C-alpha cells in the first residue's frame, strides 16, 4: 500500500519572493518532484494564500479583520485552482477540494467521501479554503486534513527556512538548529512553527511532521527520504 503524505505549500512559497503572485519556476520544480512521487505515494496538498492576501493584512487596507480572513480563505481557492491548472498541463491527475463553496473554481466541497473518492481515483488531492472558517490558520487546516486522509507524514515546506531553531536564526546568531523535537517541547518553548491548535491536533492524532526548506534542490524528495537538513516533530 502506498504511503499517504500531506504537503503544505505556503502562498509565499508559490510567489518565491517575486513581485508576481506565482513563480512558474518554483511550481515547475515542485511538479517535477511530484511526478517522481506519484507512483509510490498518495499525495495531499494544503495550499496557503499569502501571495494574494493574508487575514492579518486587513489593517493595511483599512478593512475589517473578518473580511481580511474571508479574503485570505478565497485566496487559497484561487491558488488551488491555479495549481490544478498547472497539474492539468502536465497531465497529473488531481482533484481540487474546497472548504468553502466556489463552484466555478472548485467543483467539490471537502468531505470524508470526496477525500476518499479522490484517493481511490489515484488523484493528487489539493485542499483549498483552509478550514472554511475565519481566524483559523492554514496550519490548523493541515492538521485537520492530515487527520481526515490518515496521512502517514506531514511535510511542511518553509520558504527559505530549513527547519526549526531555538530562535529566529536571522535575528539571533546563537540560535541552535533542532533536528528533532516533540510536540510537548515545541509547545512548552513556544516555537512558533505552527499554531498551538495545529500542534495539539497533530499530537492527539500521533502525526509526524517534517519541517524543511521548500526552496532547496529536490527538497520534497530529500525530506521524504530523510536526506538533507530538516526537523522531525513527533509525539
Swiss-Prot record:
Enzyme Commission number: 2.7.4.22
Enzyme class, UniProt record, top EC level: transferase
Biological or metabolic pathway of the protein: Pyrimidine metabolism; CTP biosynthesis via de novo pathway; UDP from UMP (UMPK route): step 1/1
Subunit structure: Homohexamer.
Pfam family, one: AA_kinase
Domain of life: Bacteria
Annotated localization: Cytoplasm
Matches recorded under HAMAP family: PyrH_B
GO molecular function: ATP binding; UMP kinase activity
Catalysed reactions, as listed in the record: UMP + ATP = UDP + ADP
Stated family: Belongs to the UMP kinase family.
Lineage, highest ranks first: Bacteria, Bacillati, Mycoplasmatota, Mycoplasmoidales, Mycoplasmoidaceae
Protein role: Catalyzes the reversible phosphorylation of UMP to UDP.
This protein's GO CC annotations: cytoplasm
Residues binding ATP: 8-11, 50, 54, 159, 165, 168
Keyword Kinase: yes
InterPro entries, alphabetized: AceGlu_kinase-like_sf, Asp/Glu/Uridylate_kinase, Uridylate_kinase, Uridylate_kinase_bac
Entry-linked SUPFAM superfamilies: Carbamate kinase-like
Activity regulation, free text: Inhibited by UTP.
Annotated protein name in UniProt: Uridylate kinase
Positions contributing to UMP binding: 49, 131-138
